Amino acid sequence: YEICACLVGSEMCIRDSCATLLTSEPVRIKNIPDISDVNNQIRLLEDVGVKVTRNAPGDFTFQADEVNMEYVQSDEFLARCTKLRGSVMLIGPMIARFGRAMVAKPGGDKIGRRRLDTHFLGIQKLGAKFDYDIRRGVYDIHAGRLCGTYMLLDEASVTGTANIIMASVLAMGTTTIYNAACEPYIQQLCHLLNRMGANISGIASNLLTIVGVDSLHGAAHTVLPDMIEVGSFIGMAAMVGDGISIKNVSYDNLGIIPYTFSRLGVQVLRHGDDLFIPRHDHYEIDSFLDGSFMTLSDAPWPGLTPDLLSVLLVVATQAKGTVLIHQKMFESRLFFVDKLIDMGAQIILCDPHRAVVVGHDHQIRLRGGRMTSPDIRAGIALLIAAMSADGTSRISNIEQIDRGYENIESRLTALGACIKRVEE
């Protein structure tokens, strides 16, 4: 079988599309997925006056030459912000170009506290003023032209770093961001901005230097394949089926992901920029050199992305051996393991951050059942578990999966899965 991993993650597309607010000229972005989070963000940009042209599937041109700042202050816009976490990414480009931004506390995944301090403190250091309306739950941000400065971020926040970068590119003078996130998502945003005329150096490191320019111009950009989707399909192929090829994965941007799966005993074979995951009747978890059982934990890039821990946990349920999954960066992403325990998985939830998985070594199949998807990544993990389980499973709240995976049921059905979308 072959499945083409040529799509992108919602976060990356959202940041890149917001960067189009920094210029009045057209910016063309290719490889945009048809997923709900991205579609909602594009509609939000259209609502504020950005002209969006769909050239072909996944190929859009954005032109922000008639942005309606009055709409940005409207209750309708602010109500939209509460339902879409990506709305916070409008702050950086809007305050940089227009000197004004308003945003309500955004929505998104229910995976614990996701504070906005890094965004706000960084943009404040550039000279912006923040007023918070407690009654409406709205931030009113305003500034003259921002001024470059040195800042040491309190956390290597991906969205916070992106927002500060976009605010800095039009600031006077030089901005230095230390402890910046350096994920491929951030690298690609910086490359896009440089093609638009920005002056950003230190890309791929945690120390970025941004020399402000007077204006940006149009550019063309192709977004990277989504490494989380690639990892999800690796996990799926390990659990069930006769093996798959995943095409055009941008291997050099996968980081530690293939190695992490290999520590669970999963074979990930590279052929150029493609991956092949063979059929796995058996796979065994490594142990550390001193004989202690394996621990997998998330960390800021180039460490393991937290978005794949849910998938790795499910894969471990059918491995031979024991692994500790340690979710350090969020505090509520492991609660979905109760549903896996109901399916017959051997998991001990130690606390909100740690779970011990004792694998079945493919000797005992999971049982199908009813479950609810709490967030994007737990949703795809439960779907993988259901595909490998004995019997029929029913997953509700699949809108969460739709937020991050394009046409997931039709793509998996093409690989031989039996998945049907039903109305409840």
Where are each of the predicted segments found?
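C-terminal structural cap/anchor segments
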Residues: 295-359
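Self-splicing inteins and homing endonuclease
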Residues: 5, 42, 50-79, 128-154, ...
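Conserved phosphate/oxyanion-binding catalytic-loop motifs
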Residues: 74, 79-97, 230, 372-381
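Single conserved hydrophobic/aromatic residue that forms the stacking wall/gate
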Residues: 1-9, 14
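Structural signal for terminal/edge beta-strands and the immediately following C-terminal loop/tail
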Residues: 333-335, 358, 362, 395-424
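Flexible glycine-/small-residue-enriched beta->alpha junction loops
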Residues: 84-97, 115-169
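Short glycine/threonine-rich catalytic loop with a Thr-x-Gly-x-Asp
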Residues: 10-11, 160-161, 223-232, 302-309, ...
